[in-house]
Amino acid sequence: MTNIRKTHPLIKIVNHSFIDLPTPSNISAWWNFGSLLGLCLIIQILTGLFLAMHYTSDTMTAFSSVTHICRDVNYGWLIRYMHANGASMFFICLYLHVGRGLYYGSYIYFETWNIGIVLLFAIMATAFMGYVLPWGQMSFWGATVITNLLSAIPYIGTSLVEWIWGGFSVDKATLTRFFAFHFILPFIVAALVMVHLLFLHETGSNNPSGLISDSDKIPFHPYFTIKDILGVLFLTLTLMTLVLFSPDLLGDPDNYTPANPLSTPPHIKPEWYFLFAYAILRSIPNKLGGVLALVFSILILMLSPILHTSKQRSMMFRPLSQCLFWILAADLFTLTWIGGQPVEHPFIIIGQTASILYFSIILIILPLVSSLENKLLKW
C-alpha cells in the first residue's frame, strides 16, 4: 500500500515541502533562518492573538489596557514581552536571512527574492503599526513623525496624511485603524510566505558554493529537521533570556509615559530595527529626498539580480567581494548606531558618510569589483 503522506491531497503538499523535499547536502547554518522566521511568525501571531483579547484600541484606554495585561491577566506580562521582544528576534533573523541571500547570491532566483522583499516591507509596516498601539509617548510621536513623511509627496501629500490619520492629527481614528491593520497584516504575511516557499520549491534551494547541486541532494527530513531544531533551541533560549531577565533592554523608557500631544520627547526615534533606515532618512536635509532615500534603502535590494556582474553566483570564492560585503555590514551597524543619536555634530556627518557608502557599495563598488574578479580569474 502506498504511504498516505504521498497520496493524500493535503498531506502530500506538506510532504513535498518539509519531508521529501530534495535539499542540497552542503547547506550551512545560514540556511536555518527560514525556519526560524516561520517560528517567529507563529510566536507573534499566537501572542498577538492573546494580547488582542485584552487590548482596547481607544486613546483613552489603550495605555491602561496594556498596563492591565501586564498586571492583572494571567501571565499577561509574559505574553506582552514575548510579543515585543519576539519582534526584535524576528528582525534579527530577517536581516541575517537577507544578508545570507546577498552573500551567497540567492537573489538569482528573482521571483523568490522579490517576494521576500515584499515580505520585508509588509513585516516592517506591521511592526511600525504595532509600536503605535501601546499609546506611550514614543508610540504617539513616532506615529506622528513617520506618517508625516508622506506629506513630502508633491500635490497630494497633505491630503494623504490627513486621510491616513482620519483627522487633523494622530488620534482615536488613527489608533483604531492601526490596530485593525496590525491584526490583519500578519495573516497576509503568512499567505505571502506560502508564495515565497512555492517559488523557492520551483527552483530548489541555493547552497554555499553557488553551484548546481542536483546530483547531491538529500531529503529534508530527518537531516535538516534535526538541524533546524538546534536553531529553534538557540532562538527560544535567546528570546526567553531576553524576556525573563531584561524585557525592556531593546525598548524605549519614553513609552512608559502615556501619550501626550502637548509634550514632545527630546529624541524621537523608532525601534532599533528601523534605526539604519531612520539614519539614512535624517542624513538628507531635504524632506522629499530623505523619504525617497528611506524607501530606496530597502527597495535597492530588488536591483541585486540586475547588478550581479560576477561569473560566480556565491561570494564563497570571491575574497574582494567578501571584504566589501563585511564593510557593508559594518556600515549598517554604524547607521543603526547613528539613528539612535541626537542630530548634532559629529553624528550628522558620520550618518551622511555612512549613507553615501551604503548606496555606493551596492550600486557602484560591488558590481565593479565583481567585474574585476572576473578579469583576475582569466590571469
Swiss-Prot record:
Keyword flag Membrane: yes
Membrane topology listed for this record: Multi-pass membrane protein
Name of this chain's protein: Cytochrome b
Co-factor requirement: heme b
Coiled coil (residue ranges): none
Function: Component of the ubiquinol-cytochrome c reductase complex (complex III or cytochrome b-c1 complex) that is part of the mitochondrial respiratory chain. The b-c1 complex mediates electron transfer from ubiquinol to cytochrome c. Contributes to the generation of a proton gradient across the mitochondrial membrane that is then used for ATP synthesis.
InterPro entries linked to this entry: Cyt_b/b6_C, Cyt_b/b6_C_sf, Cyt_b/b6_N, Cytb/b6-like_sf, Cytochrome_b, Cytochrome_b_C_euk/bac, Cytochrome_b_N_euk/bac, Di-haem_cyt_TM
UniProt remark on cofactor binding: Binds 2 heme b groups non-covalently.
Record's miscellaneous remark: Heme 1 (or BL or b562) is low-potential and absorbs at about 562 nm, and heme 2 (or BH or b566) is high-potential and absorbs at about 566 nm.
GO MF entries: metal ion binding; ubiquinol-cytochrome-c reductase activity
PANTHER family: CYTOCHROME B (PTHR19271:SF16)
Cellular localisation: Mitochondrion inner membrane
Subunit structure as annotated in this protein's UniProt entry: The cytochrome bc1 complex contains 11 subunits: 3 respiratory subunits (MT-CYB, CYC1 and UQCRFS1), 2 core proteins (UQCRC1 and UQCRC2) and 6 low-molecular weight proteins (UQCRH/QCR6, UQCRB/QCR7, UQCRQ/QCR8, UQCR10/QCR9, UQCR11/QCR10 and a cleavage product of UQCRFS1). This cytochrome bc1 complex then forms a dimer.
Residues reported in the UniProt entry to bind heme b b566: H97, H196
Positions annotated to bind heme b b562: H83, H182
Gene name per UniProt: MT-CYB
Keywords, in A-Z order: Electron transport, Heme, Iron, Membrane, Metal-binding, Mitochondrion, Mitochondrion inner membrane, Respiratory chain, Transmembrane, Transmembrane helix, Transport, Ubiquinone
GO terms of biological process kind: mitochondrial electron transport, ubiquinol to cytochrome c
Family per record: Belongs to the cytochrome b family.
Transmembrane segments: 33-53, 77-98, 113-133, 178-198, 226-246, 288-308, 320-340, 347-367
Species in which this protein is naturally found: Petaurista elegans (Spotted giant flying squirrel)
Binding of a ubiquinone, residues: H201
One GO CC term on file: respiratory chain complex III
